[in-house]
Amino acid sequence: MFNTNDRVVDICMGISFFIAFMYGAIMMFDSTFLIDRYDNPASNPDTQTISIFMFWLGAANIGAAFGVIYMGYKGLDRAYFAYAVPLLFFFIIWNIAPAQASGNYTGIVLLSISLVALIIARSRSGFPSNPFDIPKADKYFGTDDMITKVLLFLGLIGQGFNVIYYFVRPDAIIEDTPVLAMSVEAQQFATAMMLLSLAWVISLLYQMRAGLSMTMISVGLLISTIYFVGMINYMITSGGAGGNPLIGISFTFFFVGSVIVFFRNQSKA
């Protein structure tokens, strides 16, 4: 697996997969399991808001787990580590406040284990030990396909906008989405969504220099598909009431763009 005979790499990537898949499945299909352990009903009696945020973050975890499966067949991909390692580090820091408030440090421990596992796997992968020693492709994103370049640039701009706009209006995603209710916990999850966008910015900047990664394109396609299907399901079941048009447009463009980029570059998969 992973185009390596190193059993340590296999074990470390397996650990990372298990933790990502476990959290993804729980967040998407049984969010109350985590809400009961971290949420404070006194300050946030509305668990629907947290469930929506958990669905979004759960999709990101499922995407990360799928990336490990993809690399199991195709080999380790440096672009995946450029995405997953910063994301895990961000989420460990992000988990400190909820852990202190609830006294439950399980999340920090598991994320730390996953981070260490990825670092060990990367260190034994044969990649340059210096993570900033990034090979430079002949062209942006390493491709002559202008449509692919434009879509990836738009993705970079969109994710960068999410990060910048968070610092301008930290509560915008909550205030502009009627179905979401304001609370301390909701604000913390809004921060988590910004950190997810920041990890994507790092990954896209890496790919812009080193060349596009079919691992990350596949990860993005899976996440965007889950977001898009979830959005359609919400529109059907609720009639669209309480939604955020900007989020809907973003999810749609994310999905359509991911599909186009994937199929225009599938020969590299």
Predicted regions and their residues:
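Membrane-interfacial, low-structure loops and terminal tails that flank and connect transmembrane helices
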Residues: 1-2, 126-147
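Membrane-interfacial loop-to-transmembrane alpha-helix junctions, especially the N-terminal start
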Residues: 9-13, 75-86, 148-152, 212-223
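Alpha-helical transmembrane segments of multi-pass integral membrane proteins
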Residues: 9-28, 114-117, 143-168, 257
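Core segments of alpha-helical transmembrane spans in multipass integral membrane proteins
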Residues: 18-22, 48-72, 157-161, 184-209, ...
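Perimembrane loop-to-helix junctions flanking transmembrane segments
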Residues: 36-49, 175-185
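Hydrophobic alpha-helical membrane segments
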Residues: 80-96, 196-203, 217-234, 252-257
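Membrane-helix boundary connector in multi-pass membrane proteins
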Residues: 92-107, 228-247
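Membrane-water interface at the C-terminal end of transmembrane alpha helices
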Residues: 114-134, 253-269
